[in-house]
Amino acid sequence: VKKNILLFFLLVLTLASITFAAPLKGTIQVVGSTSVQPLAEELAQAFMAKNPGVKIFVQGGGSGAGITSAINGTADIGNSSRELKPEEATAGIHETVIAKDGIAVIAHPANSVKNLTVEEIQKIYLGEITNWKEVGGPNLSIALVNREAGSGTRGAFEELVMGKNAGKMSNKTLVQASTGAVQQTVAITKEAIGYISLGSLDPKAVKALLVNGVEASDQNITNKTYKLWRPFLMLTKTAPRGVTKAFIDWILSMEGQKIVARDYITVK
């Protein structure tokens, strides 16, 4: 009997020590980069399926809007597809790298040009090279497609390709407000050149050019032979807490990174 009583008390103590996690509940507002947006939406859907008490609302607006929203606390998470500038980093916001993504330089599929050097791309966007025949292509005036000021993809492109000439880009460009709009424009414009998120590339619609003879691919970004890539950041006003922390922690888990790996480069 004493043995049974002892076992009973041990069982009670064991059960008492188990903490049952309450179901997650809450709302998360996510704002920012249109390059990060498709991935953020996919991650949000998977997380909400696991946690029916959580509602996540994802919208674009560009990296500038995401960074500002995080600094001001007007969104729970701000998405950025470029590194923070020094003045942004000093605002005290907390950043989490959730993925890495390449920048693909794209042309119309019918364009015979297959490769451009970084210097040639820079000269094209400076307006110094204006015809495709100057880089071995057809006799067509080059139509420049650019992203809007505040775009993280544009910010990364300016840093990685334009360098100190970032402020001198030609103003004879067709400015588009999202990765999808750039891709769509290049797909229907034979003389166009543009740049987009590699993870959003549709090879049936546009052609990704080699850069310095290297293909834009996850493998070449990982082995550091393709140089045009940037991090995908999730930004919060302070260290993430509550349901926001649970969401970001899950993104960094094996389960979350499996979703990242479908189209992007994992951080683990």
Enumerate the predicted regions with their spans.
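Positively charged n-region of N-terminal signal peptides that target proteins for export
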Residues: V1-L7
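Bacterial N-terminal signal peptides
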Residues: L7-S17
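Exported/periplasmic ABC-transporter solute-binding proteins
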Residues: F20-K268
